[in-house]
Amino acid sequence: MATIKDVAKMAGVSTTTVSHVINKTRFVAKETEQQVLQAIKNLNYSPSAVARSLKVNTTKSIGMIVTTCETPYFAEIIHSVEELCYRQGYSLFLCNTQNNPEKIKNHLDMLAKKRVDGLLVMCAEYTQNSLNLLATFEDLPMVVMDWGPFNENTDLIQDNSFSGGYIATKYLIDNGHKDIAIISGELKKTTAVMRYQGFEKAMQEANLAINPDWIMEGFFEPEDGYECMNKILVQDKLPTAVFCCNDVMALGAISAIGEKGLKVPDDISVIGYDNIHASRFFSPPLTTIHQSKSRLGVQAINLLFKRISEKGKEHEIIEIYPELVIRKSVKTL
């Protein structure tokens, strides 16, 4: 394997000059630069990433801590982040935590040893243990995505789940629905609470009662939508519409409704949340709340790149607002 000394010898220059050409740390005459680059090409020389990182104080790598990469919502965001990192010449270290504080600690320790240039954090919930762990890495440029907490040491991208819950519920009300159920996430989790509070505000503004028997909690999985919807369907009185707090729970709810011989939206309307790629292919195509996954990912990684290059600047909060996507799963009464 060729070394930097081999390149210097072939190009007729010093190893210091070769280093300056590779790292672009000092002006080198064009002719000399071409000689070095040609020698690198001829010898198929690949500079040591570790050695380069020590000299220029960068590893061209980003760490990303996520709850999981399996759900469609997270997967779409991760894809946009990875794509932009690739275009910018950065490697992405993706770490799944399942919200386990021990895993978070181990992943953070590993990323610190890798000397990543910055960190993206996107977890479904932030326990106090998790927050304490993140606080110990305050010197590392960090952007917290989606529903994370804000502190003076991090930048934050906010997704406005409260607004999304309000928009979804108001759309049902504007279409004549008064008897509205909600299939939420766990109401001890931030994102579920915010979407529920948006639902609650819209119902209160319209002077509509919230039936406690129609408030269901799941874990944002299709099985939860299915099981929660079945619990609603065995009741004497049925809602005319259901707000499912993510699209995959809406898929489960639609399946349960169909198994009972009922139709969406003829018998029960369904609105989802997230606008995952598959939602337009549901039967019927799902009316939902659009939260741009690609925009969230792009905003986050661009903010992190900015933080890496401008470490002394004041930290920022960037808000992304959800939008209604109307398809065919809600009926006008």
Swiss-Prot record:
It holds the Pfam family LacI. It comes from the Bacteria. Gene3D superfamilies: 3.40.50.2300, lambda repressor-like DNA-binding domains (1.10.260.40). The keyword Chloroplast does not apply. SMART domains: HTH_LACI. Hypoxanthine binds at residues 73, 189, 191, 220, 274. Keywords: DNA-binding, Purine biosynthesis, Repressor, Transcription, Transcription regulation. Pathway: Purine metabolism; purine nucleotide biosynthesis [regulation]. Residues 4-23, 48-56 bind DNA. One of its GO terms (molecular function) is DNA-binding transcription factor activity. Residues 2-56 form the HTH lacI-type domain. GO terms for biological process: negative regulation of DNA-templated transcription; purine nucleotide biosynthetic process. InterPro entries: HTH_LacI, LacI/GalR-like_sensor, Lambda_DNA-bd_dom_sf, Peripla_BP_I, Tscrpt_reg_HTH_PurR. Consists of two structural and functional domains: an N-terminal DNA-binding domain, approximately the first 60 residues, and a larger C-terminal domain, approximately 280 residues, which imparts the function of corepressor binding and oligomerization. Is the main repressor of the genes involved in the de novo synthesis of purine nucleotides, regulating purB, purC, purEK, purF, purHD, purL, purMN and guaBA expression. PurR is allosterically activated to bind its cognate DNA by binding the purine corepressors, hypoxanthine or guanine, thereby effecting transcription repression. HAMAP family: HTH_type_PurR (MF_01277). Homodimer. This is HTH-type transcriptional repressor PurR. The lineage of its organism: Bacteria, Pseudomonadati, Pseudomonadota, Gammaproteobacteria, Pasteurellales. The gene is purR.
